[in-house]
Amino acid sequence: QKNKLKYLVGKVDMIESVDSEELIRLIDKRAQNLGIVQDILIEVNIGGEASKSGVKPEEVEALVALAASLPGVEPRGLMAIPPVAHEPGANRAVFAAMRQLFIDIKGKTYNNKVNIDCLSMGMSGDFEDAIAEGATQVRVGTALFGARPANRVNG
């Protein structure tokens, strides 16, 4: 969300859901104004779901190259939130596709500017498969803290 960037840039180690050229340029501008370099992850819509944000896999390389060319941002890798899995192993192929995309991006030099080292994918229900497919970060909030309470309507 563009309106929250002014609160994030320089206050978090990494912005993990960057999915457009516009966001990259806004982060770069804010980071330069602060005299810092902001680490980012490019969010990939690996499942092609209309309900999820993220770029198409074929758009990733151009965004990483753009970020690598700007002084205020450093692309560190990729992140994805997989489709909801209703059975164990259901997202294994999705994680394998993300791993291959990560390997492809990591293999590019981008003028030796970047250190692509983060593959963020997998959640409480499928993190083991994500790790087996190369994830370096997982989201396991539900496993640690339990399910979020259902939304309540105040009345």
Question: Which residue stretches match the model-derived regions?
Answer:
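Conserved alpha/beta-domain cores
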Residues: 1-125, 131-133, 145-147
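C-terminal helical cap(s) of enzyme catalytic domains, especially alpha/beta-barrels
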Residues: 131-155
